[in-house]
């Protein structure tokens, strides 16, 4: 019995080391090599492509009004640039690292909301700065807020 317990402890410690080595770094820099849509990017770091899902925001879907605009605006801001990725290490159900992305000290996430290419994703974020940026974009009637009745992406996906 003691041998089984000892064997279990050894295997458990080996397994935890393997899990730790697979974790993504929470903060890193890399080159933006693809813009999948307004809020999902691929960033090359240390020879590995990492998929990033922007935190605090939700951009229109590609098939949705302003979806292509959000992607083009994101491309303009950061495609081909060196980006700093800041994350708490959380991933979404698609295993994308959830993070803020900075290019030239500008937060891409905030710029998308500020310019009306994203909603503050209140289901997953209670950040007041993002709420204020969305409120300002609505008041300034920019981007998707020029639409008479913009549909939030989480509602669009229900269709």
Give, region by region, the residue ranges found by the protein language model:
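Small beta-barrel nucleic-acid-binding modules, primarily SNase/OB-fold domains
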Residues: 2, 8-159
């Amino acid at each position: 019995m003691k041998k089984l317990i000892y064997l279990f402890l050894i295997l458990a410690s080996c397994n935890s080391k393997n899990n730790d080595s697979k974790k993504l770094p929470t903060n890193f820099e890399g080159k933006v090599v693809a813009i999948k849509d307004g809020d999902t990017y691929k960033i090359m770091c240390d020879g590995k492509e990492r998929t990033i899902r922007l935190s605090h925001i939700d951009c229109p879907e590609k098939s949705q009004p302003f979806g292509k605009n959000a992607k083009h605006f994101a491309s303009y801001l950061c495609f081909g640039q060196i980006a700093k990725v800041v994350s708490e290490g959380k991933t979404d159900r698609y295993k994308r690292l959830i993070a803020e992305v900075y290019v030239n000290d500008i937060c891409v996430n905030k710029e998308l909301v500020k310019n009306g290419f994203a909603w503050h994703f209140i289901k997953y974020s209670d950040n007041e700065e993002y709420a204020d940026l969305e409120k300002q974009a609505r008041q300034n009637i920019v981007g998707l807020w020029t639409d008479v009745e913009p549909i939030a992406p989480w509602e669009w996906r229900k269709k």
